[in-house]
Amino acid sequence: MPTINQLVRKGRQKPVYVNKVPALEACPQKRGVCTRVYTTTPKKPNSALRKVCKVRLTNGFEVISYIGGEGHNLQEHSVVLIRGGRVKDLPGVRYHTVRGSLDTAGVKDRKQARSKYGAKRPK
């Protein structure tokens, strides 16, 4: 426990806040254009081909974004909406594409958790 004199000299240090999604610039989502759509493999204990795309945002940032859900219609020059949210087993992937908005189609035949994948209510 510091003395009053030590606190007068030094003061308490504020914890440094590190922004986890700097490219969004305090916005909930950002629009961008796909520059490359490809698959990549996850870190050690997991095994899959994860669908990701490199996106050039409207503010000039170039980020890697994960495409969730089964199947997608994205290709180069597709306009996508990006939200925050990292993928734990893909290093460098700190953003998600929003399904069902702009050029990104919703997931077909999705019955549960539809709002997360831009799927309409089945008849």
Swiss-Prot record:
Annotated segments matching region Disordered: 104-123
Q: Which residues cross the membrane?
A: none
One Gene Ontology cellular component annotation?
small ribosomal subunit
Is Ribonucleoprotein a UniProt keyword of this protein?
A: yes
Q: Which SUPFAM superfamilies match?
A: Nucleic acid-binding proteins
Q: Is Zinc one of the keywords?
A: no
Do you know which HAMAP family this protein is assigned to?
Ribosomal_uS12_B (MF_00403_B)
Family note: Belongs to the universal ribosomal protein uS12 family.
- Subunit structure as annotated in this protein's UniProt entry: Part of the 30S ribosomal subunit. Contacts proteins S8 and S17. May interact with IF1 in the 30S initiation complex.
Q: What is this protein called?
A: Small ribosomal subunit protein uS12
Q: Which organism is it from?
A: Neisseria meningitidis serogroup B (strain ATCC BAA-335 / MC58)
Identify the gene encoding this protein: rpsL
